[in-house]
């Protein structure tokens, strides 16, 4: 079944520059200048995704849109004024370090506002009934950003800013955020840790970023207790680990919460060739997770689903993973075939690893008080 999928993109988002880096290391001292892309959070992963959509013909089947930048009113619902002022001043001065692993260049402030604006508009389009679902190709990403501190290539909390705008404009009460970026969604967690109107679920590589963080015991506080679920997965985990996490934790949690809107923080850095992680997913892993969460949205949220782009640092492979997600959202299949899918499938963990990971997931599900998921059927 084909669906009305809106795709939010603006070329200016690709113009954010982090300055001279080799992967994530500032050039200087013992760090040599890079021969190619430079900083890991390069525009090329997003540019090549958009190019693959265009060349495959899929763009023509989507509602291609841009959006205005996030307003001060939008941003101030999440970020204090002094943070906006500090960010703008550093950007206007030519850039520098805004926080841990958060370098910016000239114009980054305005581009980050636009990135958040794309996410806001994506939620607006779905909640207004203009699209069945939406994908926001936001850059810079947002899920590590704290209210008053940039972190991990993130400068505004794009998804939180969009959710708070949606609450103000559309009166939506219950929103679920599923973060499958390989790095923990610590910014989203911090913003909603004491609230029960947003369910935050993070699937991430155990101990990857923030360095050493697992988070399984961090389930929220006060009214938010039980509404923050962290699912740390063992390094080296692959397709089976994520399918088990979806079936055993994510889907039952959505069933219990019954959101009116689901937002996915979609990083593609759990893919098997990403330079900043050690997981083993291929494009069909992201396709399968999208199908699961889409069916959950149709069951609980009237189909209202928005996917917001986060990380993913393999220029060669991110486009195939992103294409798979957008094909699944839209119900339109292109002629593109993933050239690494079968190779990655052969590298999947052995049975002993899979059994150990499954046991850990069972223990987490019991800790979270979750019953096994029933098979989801799309709403008719």
Swiss-Prot record:
Q: Name one Pfam family in it.
A: Hist_deacetyl
- Enzyme Commission number, as recorded: 3.5.1.-
User: Which enzyme class?
Assistant: hydrolase
The organism's place on the tree of life at top rank? Bacteria
| Activity regulation (record text) | Is inhibited by azobenzenes, stilbenes and arylazopyrazoles.
- Gene knockout outcome: Growth of a mutant strain lacking this gene in the presence of both acetylcadaverine and acetylputrescine is comparable to growth of the wild-type. The deletion mutant strain shows a 25% increase in biofilm biomass after 24 hours of incubation compared to wild-type cells.
- Report the cofactor remark: Binds 1 zinc ion per subunit.
Q: What InterPro entries does this protein's entry cite?
A: HDAC_PDAC, His_deacetylse, His_deacetylse_dom, His_deacetylse_dom_sf, Ureohydrolase_dom_sf
Reported effect, residue 143 to A: Loss of enzymatic activity against both acetylated and trifluoroacetylated lysine substrates
Quick one: effect of changing residue 313 to F?
Answer: Loss of enzymatic activity against acetylated lysine substrate but no effect on activity with trifluoroacetylated lysine substrate
Q: Does the keyword Transport apply?
A: no
Q: How is it used?
A: Could be a suitable photopharmacological target for photopharmacological antimicrobial chemotherapy using photoswitchable inhibitors.
Gene3D superfamilies linked: Histone deacetylase domain
Its GO biological process annotations read: epigenetic regulation of gene expression
Enzyme active site? 144
Keyword check for Cytoplasm? no
Record text on subunit structure and interactions: Homotetramer; dimer of head-to-head dimers.
Q: Which family does it belong to?
A: Belongs to the histone deacetylase family.
Record's function text:
Probable protein deacetylase that catalyzes deacetylation of acetylated lysine residues. In vitro, exhibits high activity against artificial HDAC (histone deacetylase) substrates containing acetylated and trifluoroacetylated lysine residues. Is not able to deacetylate acetylated polyamines.
Protein name, entry field: Histone deacetylase-like amidohydrolase
